[in-house]
């Protein structure tokens, strides 16, 4: 199956993505991460109002194969979390870049936050180098 990496997103090497719209960031996990994890069974996310710091774990996702920490690509305050994904994490795989988003965050410094992220092209190249996808 050909994995999708939308061009309008930025990616982390830890496989989270970000869609930045002004000062609001939508955060989720990439189709590649979902494929590697397999069937998702548990998702832990911060509460609305919690602060996130780029590079510090904000939650975790578990599958039948593994458990992984989640890392925010930006610093800011959680303004929404996808309750449907917490209740039924297995459906994240159905639409990871649309309905499968995890958090919405009000970003502190939108102009500076994307500095260490990857374009879709660079993310795919990283994966091809590591995994030969």
Curated annotation (Swiss-Prot):
Its cofactor is (R)-lipoate. Signal peptide: none annotated. Keywords: Lipoyl. GO terms for biological process: glycine decarboxylation via glycine cleavage system. GO terms for cellular component: cytosol; glycine cleavage complex. The modification N6-lipoyllysine is found at residue 65. Pfam families: GCV_H. Binds 1 lipoyl cofactor covalently. Residues 24-106 form the Lipoyl-binding domain. Belongs to the GcvH family. This is Glycine cleavage system H protein. It comes from Crocosphaera subtropica (strain ATCC 51142 / BH68).
